[in-house]
Amino acid sequence: MDRARPGRRRASSEIVTEGKRKKSSPADLQKITKLLTVKSEDVLAQSPLPKLRGSECWWTRSLRNKVICLDHKTTKAAHGCPPKALPKRHLKVMLTNVLWTDLGREFRKTLPRNDAKLCDTSKVQSDSLPSTSVDSIETCQRLDPLHQSLNLSERIPRVILTDIRQTELGRKYLKIPSVTEASLSDTASPKSEELSSSADGSLESCQNVNHLKSFLSERGSKPSRTGDISAKEAANGRQEQGDDGDIAPEMVTPQSKDFNSGNKGDYHEEGTSNKNTSYSHSETDHTPVSRKRKKRGRSNFHNSHNPKSSVDKSTEYIKEEENESTVSSKLEESNEDSHQDPAPPEGLTPDSLETEATNVCSFVVQEPDVSAASGRACSPNKSSESSVSSEVAENSSAAEKGEASTVKEAPPPGGNSEENQLLMSAEPIVVSSDEEGPVEHKNSVILKLQPSQDYEFMSENQTTSDPQLSELMLGACESVQVSSELCPYNPDMENISCINPNSEMDLKLDFIFTCVYIGKIKGTSKGCITFTKKYIKIPFQVSMNEISLTVDTARLKRFGLWESKDDDHSKRSHAILFLWVSSNYLQDIQTQLENPMLSQQSKANEFIFLELNSPISQREELKLKDIMMEIGATNGELQLSCPLPWVQAFPLFQDLSPQEISFLHYYCASASSFPAVAGADMKKKPVSQPSNADVVKPTYTFLHKQSSGCYSLSITSSPDEEWREVRNTGPVQKLIVYPPPPTKGGLGVTNEDLECLEEGEFLNDVIIDFYLKYLLLEKASDELVERSHIFSSFFYKCLTRKENNLTEDNPDLSVAQRRHRRVRTWTRHINIFNKDYIFVPVNESSHWYLAVICFPWLEEAVYEDFPQTVSQEFQDQQSQHDNKTIDNDPHTTSTVFTSAEESQSTETSMSVPKKMCKRPCILILDSLKAASIQNTVQNLREYLEVEWEVKRKTHREFSKTNMVDLCPKVPKQDNSSDCGVYLLQYVESFFQDPIVNFELPIHLEKWFPRHVIKTKREDIRELILKLHLQQQKGSSS
C-alpha cells in the first residue's frame, strides 16, 4: 500500500474522507480480507475465543468493578517505531494470564522498576491525528526512547496479561479512577491473524495510537465504548511489537461503572443532539454535531491523566474548552452529584469529565441495579474487587427494530481527512483473575451487547430526529430495573387532588367534593376541602350564602371513607368522606354556619358527610390515613388511626329520620346510592340491619296479668323461643265509667282505649275526654270549676263538619248559623258567657291542640285590682320559685311553675299599677304549630256571635279587635305522636297555675318540665287501672 497516500483504509466497503463517502476498490477489499482471515494455532490452542459466537473478541477482566478489553490483533506494532524496524515474520497472539504461566512470571522479572515512563507514551499525543507519513515517522521516533528504556528484547513475544495490582504501575493507577473498558475490534474471526509488515501498517499504527489515547478519558465515565478505540489500541499493540521486538505491557485500570440518575440525565441530554444511532458490540456512533468534543477528547486524554504533560497541551484544546463552557457547566453539576469520589484522580480536571459525559453510548444497554450506594461505588478502593460482567444480548436485535449497527466517524472542521480510522469489531471474552475475590453484584452493571454481522457506514448528513432517538433509547432500556428508592411514583396514581407539602413538613391534602351534609343542611361545593393536622376547611354554599366551615381536628372523634362497589351507570359519585365530631363542638359549628336549623339537641348534627367528586386514589388514601394518625397521636384519639367502616357507622344514624339528617334524605334515598363496604360483609347482610352481634337477647320478660279484679305484674325468665306480642282478641271490655254512677254523663273507657297509651301511639278522643273530665273534677279548684267549662273533643269536629244541603231545614240560614245548629244542644244546660275560661280540644289532620276562649263576656280589656287571695297566692308561688322548693310529684302534679319573664312582668304590674288585665281573647296552645290557626279562630268567633244572639237575644260582633287571638310560647313536642299528651298537660298546668294577667306578651315556655311529658302516658294508664280496681270493688260489695 502506498505510504504517500493520505489517510487510512477502513475495514469496510466505504472510505470516509473530509465528509465525503468513497467506495473502495475490489483490490483493497481483497487485501484487507486476506489480512483479517489469517488464523492462529496458538490462539486455537490456548484461548477460549472459538467457544464464543460472533466475529468479535473481547477480553474482560473484573477488577474493582471494571472492564478491560484487549484485542488479539494488537500485535502489529508496539508504541511507535520506524517502518524499517518492523520484523519480516508475522506475530501471533497468545491469550493467557500472567499468574498462570511460566512466561508470565519470567516476564514480570524483566519489568523495570521505574514504571512511570510507561505513562510517558502519552506525551506523543498531538492536538490532532497525524495525517501524513512524515508525521507518522516522527511519532514513531518519539516512541523509540520509551522502548529503549524498557530494555525489551528484539524478538516479538506473545501478548500476555499482567496483574496490574502486583506492579508499581498498577499501584499508581489504583490511586486514580481510570477508564472502564477498552474495546478491541475484530472483523474477521476470534483467532489470531497475520499482521502486515508494510509501511502502511506502521503508519496506521502510529495514527491509531494518538486516537486511542484521545478517547481513553471519555471511557472514564461512559457506560459504553467506541469501536474506533478498539482499532486504535489494536494498532497500538502492533506498533510496539514492530519497534523493538519486545512487548510493552500496558494495562489500564478500569473505572467503576456504577451510574446514577445524574449520568442518565447527561446521557439522554447528549442523545438528543445525535444523528442516526444504532448499537453493536464494538462500534460507537459519534455525533457530527460534537466534532469539537471528539477532537478535544483526542488531545486531552494524557493531559487529564498526567499532570506533567501540560507542556504538550495544545492551544486548540483551550479554545475548545472555552466554546464548550456552557455545556461543561451543566455536565459538571450532574457529574458532581453522580460521582462523589473521595480522592479525585490526579490530573483529571472537571472539564475532562464534562467532555467525557457528552459522548453518547449507542451500542450498550445498561441494566443498573440502582441503590443508595451507587453514588459511592465509584470509589476505586470500594469497588476494586467488584466485577462487571458482559453478556451478549440475545434479544436486543428485536429491541433495536431490526436495524444493523452503524458507525460514523466525522472529521473535525479543519480539513483533516487523514483522520479516517479503521473500525473493527471484536467478540466479547470474559477474562478474570482468581485472586480478584468474589464478584459484588450489588454495584455491578450488566452490559448487553448487540452483535452485528453486517457493517454499515453512515454519512454525516444522515440524521436521526430527536423523537426517533428517544424511541430508540427507550426501546433499548426496556429491561432496566430501578429500585423503589430512586424510582418516582407512578403518575397513574395521581387524581384530582393535589398534595401540598409544607416547609414545616406539615401534612396537607386537598379533595374536590360536590356536596356536604350537616344535620338538616345540604350545601354545594365552593372549592376544595383541605385536611391538615390542625384543621379541616370545608368551603360550601347554602342557598345564596357562602360558608367556610373550619373544623378543629382536636374535636374529631372518628372518620370514614366509603366507596360504592355497584356497577350502575349513574353519573353520581359513590365516594363518601365521613367526619364525626364531638357533641360539645356543635355550638362552634352553629356559630360558623349562622343557621338556627342546627339544633344542639339532635345527634344528627355531629355527623358531616362529604360527597367527593370521584373516588380517591391509593396514594391519597394513604396520605389521609397518615394525617389522621398524626391527629390521633396528638389528641389522644387512637381510633382515628383506622377509618370507620360503613357497617359500623350506619347504626349510629339509622334510627334518625330523613328530616333530621339530610344525608339520608338526599343521598341515600335510593338503595343503589348507599355506599358499599369494601369487603364481603356488605354482601352478606343488608346495610339497614345491624349485625347479629349487636342484637342483645333479653334475659327476662314482663308479664301483665289480670284476674278476679286484680292487676299484677310479674317477671319471668327469657323463653327459649322468640316471644311475640299477643293482642287481646277477645270481646271489648269496659274498664271504667267516669264519672261513675249515679253521676250522669259518665264516659266509658275500654281495654282497647288503653292501647293508645303505648309509646308512639296517638291518643284517641276517649282518653282525651276522660282525662279532661278528671282534671276538671279532681284537679281544679272549686273557683276554677265555676269559672271554667270544657267542651268534648267531638265538639269542634261536629261544629265544622260538612252536611248535605237536603238535611238543612232552613236554607236561608248563614253558614255560621248552620254550624251553630249542629252543636246548639251542647250548651242547653250551661251559659258559656258566664264563664271565664272555655276549653275547646281541636283535632285537625290527626293533630291535637287546645283553644281557650278567655272572658267571652267582656267586650274589651279590663284592668282590675288583684284580689287579696290572688296577690297572696302569687307571692307564695314567687317565694317557692326563689327557694326552689317545688314539689315534682308526677302523680299529684301539684307543682306550680311560673316563668321568670311572666313573674317579672306580673310583679311589675302589681308593684307599680297593681292592676291585672282581663282581655277577651282566644288562646291557641299548640305543641307543633302545624294547624290552620286562623280558620279555627274564625270559626270560634262566628260560633260566639250566634251563641250570643241565642243566649243574650242581642247582636254582638266578635272581631279581631274585641276578640283577639294569641299564640303564646309554650313547651313544644320533640316527636310526632305526643301532641295529645301535650294538650292534656296544657290544661293540667292551666288548672294548677292559671293565667290571671293577660297583659302582653304572655310567656309560658317554662310552664312545665319536659320529664312530666315522658311519664304522662304511664300516669294515665295507672290512673285508669286504679279507677278500674276501685269500681270493681264497689260493684262486688
Swiss-Prot record:
EC class name: hydrolase
Residue stretches of biased makeup (Basic residues): 1-10, 289-299
GO BP term (any one): antiviral innate immune response
Residue span of region Disordered: 1-28, 182-420, 873-910
Entries under Gene3D superfamilies matching the protein: 1.10.418.20, Ubiquitin-related (3.30.310.130)
Pfam families: Peptidase_C48
Compositional bias of kind Basic and acidic residues: 310-320, 330-340, 879-890
Residue numbers carrying Phosphoserine: S12, S13, S25, S189, S432, S433
Enzyme Commission number(s) of this protein: 3.4.22.-
A molecular function GO annotation: SUMO-specific endopeptidase activity
Function according to Swiss-Prot or TrEMBL: Protease that acts as a positive regulator of the cGAS-STING pathway by catalyzing desumoylation of CGAS. Desumoylation of CGAS promotes DNA-binding activity of CGAS, subsequent oligomerization and activation. Deconjugates SUMO2 and SUMO3 from targeted proteins, but not SUMO1. Catalyzes the deconjugation of poly-SUMO2 and poly-SUMO3 chains. Has very low efficiency in processing full-length SUMO proteins to their mature forms.
The name this protein goes by in its record: Sentrin-specific protease 7
Protein's organism: Rattus norvegicus (Rat)
